[in-house]
């Protein structure tokens, strides 16, 4: 960010950082269908400022001076086409103003910008407005959807000087000392110079409706001033929504609160509102979204749950839910934590640990109820947040069974299935829950490792999330049935009858095939640990599997890729003894050993390709293929 300072050293002109500049261009030239969200964002910022002041005033009451009641005021000036949002919250110093309004710390900004471009392109084709801004909530900058000039005047609580920030949204902003006549005694004033097509936001009835619908739940009173100098009218009483009985709260109120606290524009898939009494007394209002935020996998993001103590905001960085539930949004209000607890000491509090345990259990149980009651709605939750659920299988041993019950998997049977459904459909003599892990769902579906299982109607879990290869090693079983990779060790398929009973009568493996397998084992001894006849293959000639002990094929690839293993172990080459290709190669005898060695190594490369790998030596693979094709052509013309 570059800056220019006036000769008196007070006024300063700066250039927005690159991401902000792009974002502002999108706001200025916005085609968003719901521009009302700018007001929700400004009110949300104002409410946060009031709550932060209330927290700081616990240790420094002098910050409140003679203005202890928090308030947000919206003032209309229709004649000048201006809209002003005032709060008497914590305010900003000059440096805080530059940092808060000139940069974006949010890790998902780039992703938001890219997604918004996609949405704009789609909406242009369809002739509709897009609503991605409501989903991601870019806060203050949304003001430029309705204003061609924005001025922010702020005075930090306890400070003497006030500062003015101004920008037309075209790439630069200025920071200057504010005149005392226009500065609030404490807090922040945001003045919007509305564009011609946004002058409707000076209509009192329209503003009242927007505020009541979108922000009537904020825990700070909101007043409306119809024109400068007029008496204020209260349009929201500041009663925190979570303190009201559930029976007194309508669905629309819950949705509006969710949109404010989550920064999403959709409706929640699940709302969890309860009051706990007993050893710990607290109220929780939590939401499970339908869509995923871009920053869910960022390690430095703020916590998704706001912590209050007796309606005083404490922090949004408390560890109130385990990481595998980081997609949940909402508030928790404790009656037991001391108001003067420091943010540093919160994490050490046994009260907080008890609250975390309670709300974690409640969220999991409510998700289980949703899954039972509305499989379609729960399916959307799983599609959005399934990878995070799976993290909990190896992170939270005490909740493993509950999390496994919530998991849904794509299988060789088709649609999403629960493990309970899977176990209920086990075949006679089936003792394991079989799975195939990999990076590509389509490749998994076509894997030769599945052939023997399909022939017997045995369902296999198809696991294509990166986390899958890890949690299966941490979850020894489900309802007494162990998890077993179809790419590792023996299959135990011999005891399970085939669907086609006529296929059970298979010809004995010939002596020549047995000898050929021994030849393969000798020829490939430096590349594979063993060569053996396969039960799992019915249509393909070969496949690679891992030894019974150690990681399966996919996990081994991941560990080698991240440097946890120095190299891959030798795989086992399984051969389908009844495949026509194997029978033909076995019938060659010892007449052309060089050709047989070429075919042996070609079979191994074939297995590697089917396993998602490349031949170990591309040049030699090409030469070997040419020799085999030449031999085949020579034989066909003989």
Swiss-Prot record:
Subunit comment: Homodimer.
High-level lineage: Bacteria, Pseudomonadati, Pseudomonadota, Alphaproteobacteria, Hyphomicrobiales
Region feature A, mapped onto this chain: 1-343
PROSITE patterns: HSP90
Organism per entry: Nitrobacter hamburgensis (strain DSM 10229 / NCIMB 13809 / X14)
SMART domains in the record: HATPase_c
Major localization class: cytoplasm
Residue segments, region B: 344-557
GO MF, one example: unfolded protein binding
Annotated family: Belongs to the heat shock protein 90 family.
Protein name: Chaperone protein HtpG
Coiled coil: none
Keyword field: ATP-binding, Chaperone, Cytoplasm, Nucleotide-binding, Stress response
Reported function: Molecular chaperone. Has ATPase activity.
Subcellular location per the Swiss-Prot or TrEMBL entry: Cytoplasm
Gene3D superfamilies referenced in this protein's UniProt entry, alphabetically: 3.30.230.80, 3.40.50.11260, Heat shock protein 90, C-terminal domain (1.20.120.790), Histidine kinase-like ATPase, C-terminal domain (3.30.565.10)
Region (C): 558-638
SUPFAM superfamilies attached to this UniProt entry: ATPase domain of HSP90 chaperone/DNA topoisomerase II/histidine kinase (SSF55874), HSP90 C-terminal domain (SSF110942), Ribosomal protein S5 domain 2-like (SSF54211)
GO cellular component: a single term: cytoplasm
HAMAP family on file: HSP90 (MF_00505)
